[in-house]
């Protein structure tokens, strides 16, 4: 007979408040993603089609985080989503794939004043991803950060 393991979700757990001499308003949660890219809360929304389009990007930006517009859109649709977020004067990122055909997408979305471009791949520790990073570095404005991943190896 198989044993059923216990599992919990966020609704099952409560953090018990404790005495503190620090007020929440005195806490600084900001982080530097790069030397020039700072966010007020250390949260980025996932570049998934069920998670981040303009409404989530705007909400994340207004809260102090960063939304990454997913790449499962046409290039034109992705640009529209980026522009909607940028119109609210908040930070925004956008995802591209790791293939050479995605360089066309990268070239076009990099003209949209992105704060960060994300190379979205299941396995980022590959020669192909390294090569696409080099190509995007040559295309991007200096102020646009590059993020590549996912990487789960120790190297």
Residue ranges and their predicted role:
Residues 2-3, 7, 13, 51-155:
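Alpha/beta enzyme core
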Residues 1-43:
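An N-cap/entry alpha-helix motif that binds or orients negatively charged groups
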């Amino acid at each position: 007979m198989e044993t059923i393991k216990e599992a919990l979700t966020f609704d099952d757990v409560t953090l018990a408040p404790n005495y503190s001499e620090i007020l929440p308003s005195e806490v600084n949660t900001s982080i530097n993603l790069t030397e020039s890219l700072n966010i007020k809360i250390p949260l980025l929304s996932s570049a998934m089609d069920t998670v981040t389009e303009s409404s989530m990007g705007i909400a994340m930006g207004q809260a102090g985080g960063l939304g990454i517009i997913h790449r499962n859109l046409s290039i034109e649709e992705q640009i529209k989503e980026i522009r909607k977020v940028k119109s609210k004067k908040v930070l925004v990122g956008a995802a591209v794939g790791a293939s050479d055909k995605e360089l066309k997408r990268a070239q076009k979305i990099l003209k949209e004043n992105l704060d960060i471009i994300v190379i979205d791949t299941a396995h980022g520790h590959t020669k192909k991803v390294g090569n696409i990073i080099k190509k995007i570095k040559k295309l991007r404005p200096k102020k646009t950060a590059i993020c590549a991943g996912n990487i789960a190896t120790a190297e």
